[in-house]
């Protein structure tokens, strides 16, 4: 019987990619980033293994949502205490912690288990254009989420 060859963790080549989120649609960007984190863009993808790459997202404060979502999309968190629910809109969270918006969108698209938590640690999000990962020599990954756009 011939078995399917599974890649060994030490033979997998994990690259670093940098993605510019400026003027990109939030959900479409998060979907593409989640695919790269999961490793679905590789031939050796295996569902139960970490075959993905590291992703650095810069310009998180410039990500956009369409329609009335800037005022209507709500982000909720709870302190665990009675009456401890905090609610803020997309605009409020973007002013306060712009990195959190992309992190929450991508985290929701990863598996809800130990593998998903490990994959999430490979996502690095920064508000400006600078990031401290130059030593890893990240490649530029172009993701175009603008319909009909030329980016």
Swiss-Prot record:
Keyword list, A-Z: Ribonucleoprotein, Ribosomal protein
PROSITE patterns listed in its UniProt record: RIBOSOMAL_L13 (PS00783)
Coiled coil: none
Single GO BP term: negative regulation of translation
One GO cellular component term: cytosolic large ribosomal subunit
Membrane-spanning residues: none
Ribonucleoprotein keyword on record: yes
SUPFAM superfamilies for the chain: Ribosomal protein L13 (SSF52161)
NCBIfam families given in the database record: rplM_bact
UniProt subunit comment: Part of the 50S ribosomal subunit.
Function: This protein is one of the early assembly proteins of the 50S ribosomal subunit, although it is not seen to bind rRNA by itself. It is important during the early stages of 50S assembly.
Protein name: Large ribosomal subunit protein uL13
Gene symbol of the encoding locus: rplM
């Amino acid at each position: 019987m011939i078995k399917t060859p599974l890649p060994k963790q030490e033979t997998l080549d994990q690259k670093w990619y940098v993605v510019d989120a400026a003027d990109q649609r939030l959900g479409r960007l998060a979907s593409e980033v989640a695919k790269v984190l999961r490793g679905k863009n590789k031939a050796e993808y295996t569902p139960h293994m970490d075959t993905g790459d590291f992703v650095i997202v810069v310009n998180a404060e410039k990500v956009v949502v369409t329609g009335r979502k800037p005022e209507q999309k709500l982000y909720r968190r709870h302190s665990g205490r009675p009456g401890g629910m905090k609610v803020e809109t997309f605009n409020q969270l973007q002013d306060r912690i712009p990195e959190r918006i992309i992190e929450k969108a991508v985290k929701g698209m990863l598996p809800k288990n130990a593998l998903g938590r490990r994959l999430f640690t490979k996502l690095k999000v920064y508000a400006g254009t600078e990031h401290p990962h130059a030593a890893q020599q990240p490649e530029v990954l172009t993701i175009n989420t603008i319909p009909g756009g030329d980016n």
